[in-house]
């Protein structure tokens, strides 16, 4: 029943999400060419891998911003809300992959890069759904979520819990992206 602290924790999570996204974008721009050069890919595959990863990194900000909002909905409204939202992600992503990989329904035909674009758009759609639910659900009205509150203590707590969890999630999620790059040299 500590509703006063919820806004501070959510704001801290959103701030950290933005900081992490900026770090990942910088890392991408400084290191992606070196990482891909190690793999000795064919020029076409190199190009696709580079821009596929860029699309994922850009989309990741939507995913990162979703994490604190998901925690909020899980805490206040129960886990069924976020479960339903994430179940929507699969058909949305499949449809967007179909559109952007093959150029259907007016989308540009992007091939492998289209898969990254589709995933990025899916992350932002999920973010939009979470924001819409939080704004329109009466359970969230009394939490003062739009009164910005910053707390260094809250950020330290986030990092203490979040770094180990985040490393695990990052390793799991990036594994799939890197597997695609590694097997690409086999055709």
What feature does the model see in each segment?
Residues 12-38:
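Alpha-helical transmembrane segments of multi-pass membrane transport and lipid-handling proteins
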Residues 80, 90-128:
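Membrane-interface helix-loop junctions in multi-pass transport and translocation proteins
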Residues 3, 75-76, 80, 106-109, ...:
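Helix-loop interface residues and adjacent transmembrane-helix termini in multi-pass membrane transporters
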Residues 36-43, 101-110, 170-187:
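Helix-terminus/linker motif at the lipid-water interface of multi-pass membrane proteins
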Residues 62-86:
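Membrane-interface junctions at transmembrane-helix termini in multi-pass inner-membrane proteins
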Residues 1-16, 77-80:
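Transmembrane-helix boundary and interhelical linker motifs in polytopic inner-membrane proteins
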Residues 112, 116-119, 131-172:
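Interhelical loop/hinge segments that connect adjacent transmembrane helices in multipass membrane
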Residues 30, 43-69:
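Alpha-helical transmembrane segments of multi-pass membrane proteins
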